[in-house]
Amino acid sequence: MLKGFAWIISVGNELLIGRVVNTNAAWLAAKLTYLGYAVRRIVVVPDEENEIVEAFRDAMERSDVVISTGGLGPTPDDITNLAFCKALGVEAEVNEEALRMVREKYESRGYPMTPEREKMAKMPPGAVPLPNPVGTAPGILYQRGDKVVVLLPGVPREMEAIFENSVEPLLKSRGPPVYFSEKVVVVRGVPEADIAPILKEVMKIDPRLYVKSHPKGFEVGAPLLHIHIYASAGSEEEAQGLVKKVAERLVELLKSRPGAEVSTS
C-alpha cells in the first residue's frame, strides 16, 4: 500500500568526490518509506546548473514527490533554487516572506544583508518558504497539481528540522494513512544461497511484503544473515499481523535447515 513514488536529489560536488557521506539521502529515504512513499531514485548531481535542471525535470516527470538537499546557501556554488526555477521555465523572484526570514537571522547576529544572502530568498513564483529553525537558508515548498517538490539545505540538522516541522505533516496528510511494521530474523549456520528458495516462497504471501537478507558473516565457513521483513497496510494492526505471520513461517522454514540457529528481534 503506497501513497506514491518519490525521488531524492542530492546536490553537491563533495558527495561525488567521496569527501562527504550522503547521510541525508538515507535519512530521507527511511522517512519517506514510513510515510508511505516508495523511493524510486536517489540521484546525486554536481553543483552544475544543467545537471540540477535535468535532475528536477526528470524527477517531476516520473514521481509524485521530489525532495532535494543542498545548494541553498549564499556561496557561488549554491544554485539549486535558481536551477529549479530554470527547470520550471520561470524566473526566480525574491520571496518577501523568505527575505524576512533570512534578514532576521542575519540581523539578529549583527550581520548586514548582502546580495549573496538575498539570493537565499529567491524561488519560483507561488513557492512557499519553509522556516529553518537551526540555520539561515529557508526550505522551499512548491506544488504543481498533485506534484510536491521540496528543496532543503544540505546541512543535516537543518534538513532534518525543516523536514520534521514542515514537510512531514504535509506528506502524512496526503492520501490514505499507511502504516509500516518490521522485524528482523537472525539465522546462523546457513549460507545465503541456500535460503534463497525460502525467501522466494514467503514473499509470495502478500504483495505488501518486502523481505531482504543482509549477510553479516562469511558465506562459506561462518554464515550469519539478518533477514529484514517489512510490510505496509492501512492499519497498524494489519501491518503488524502480516509481519508476524511471515516471520513465523520464515522461522519455521529456516529451522528445517540442518545446522540453522534462528532468532528474532
UniProtKB/Swiss-Prot annotation:
Q: Name one Pfam family in it.
A: MoCF_biosynth
- Per the record, the domain of life is Archaea
What the entry lists under PANTHER family is as follows:
NICOTINAMIDE-NUCLEOTIDE AMIDOHYDROLASE PNCC (PTHR13939), NMN AMIDOHYDROLASE-LIKE PROTEIN YFAY (PTHR13939:SF0)
User: Belongs to which family?
Assistant: Belongs to the CinA family.
Cross-referenced NCBIfam families: molyb_syn, PRK01215.1
Tell me the protein's name: Protein Pars_0096
